[in-house]
């Protein structure tokens, strides 16, 4: 069952990368959402903190994004921001992630300034998380910055296997070398 964005989405996005090799393993299609209230010091996406930044995620944009994801060259999807877990003004992000899983079954990675524990305690955020395969959680902390870390910026951030964590009811980390 296709669950499409109907009408006007309230969610804005800052950027789409058709082929991205920096935000996750292998070649990915990446969506940067707009809007974040964490205001992490030294945030590298300051312009994307405004919920007014960027363009609305329309039906046409959703279809274009999915066409990129369906490319045989694309291994998975990365969702960053802004803050994906603050996109609760409507269900546009949830619908997009659901379509990605239903139509492509490709791996979804999501970066959030919230911890896993904070996400699962909020029903709307948990519903989004249930569509995700890998979560990079926690706010960027400048005092814990480590440029040698893969896929994250500070040592407090974790790379979490979401499916195993939900099933086992405890955080299951992925060791990325």
Regions found by a protein language model. Name each.
Residues 93-109:
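Surface-exposed amphipathic alpha-helices with a cationic face
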Residues 66-72, 76, 82, 90-94, ...:
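Extended interfacial segments that mediate partner engagement and assembly in macromolecular machines
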Residues 2-32, 45-52, 171, 176:
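N-terminal [4Fe-4S]-dependent radical SAM core
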Residues 32-39:
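Short pre-active-site segment immediately N-terminal to redox-active cysteine/selenocysteine motifs
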Residues 45-60, 72-87, 105-119, 129, ...:
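Core AdoMet radical
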Residues 87-98, 145-177:
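P-loop/Walker A phosphate-binding loop and immediately adjacent motor/lid segment at beta-alpha junctions
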Residues 16-18, 63-65, 120-123:
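A generic local structural motif
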Residues 58-62, 90-98, 122-126:
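Charged helix-capping and loop-helix junction motifs
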């Amino acid at each position: 069952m296709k669950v499409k964005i109907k009408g006007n989405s309230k969610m804005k996005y800052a950027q789409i990368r058709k082929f991205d090799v920096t935000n996750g393993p292998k070649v990915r299609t990446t969506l940067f959402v707009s809007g974040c209230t964490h205001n992490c010091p030294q945030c590298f996406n300051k312009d994307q903190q405004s919920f007014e930044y960027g363009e609305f995620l329309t039906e046409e944009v959703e279809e274009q994004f999915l066409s990129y994801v369906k490319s045989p060259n694309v291994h998975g999807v990365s969702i960053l921001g802004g803050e994906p877990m603050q996109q609760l003004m409507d269900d546009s992000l949830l619908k997009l992630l659901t379509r990605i899983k239903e139509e492509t079954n490709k791996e979804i990675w999501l970066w959030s300034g919230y911890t896993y524990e904070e996400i699962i305690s909020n029903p709307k955020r948990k519903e989004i998380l249930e569509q995700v395969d890998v979560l990079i959680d926690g706010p960027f902390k400048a005092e814990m910055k480590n440029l040698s870390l893969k896929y994250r910026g500070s040592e407090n951030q974790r790379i979490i296997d979401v499916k195993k964590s939900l099933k086992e009811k405890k955080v299951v980390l992925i060791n990325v070398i």
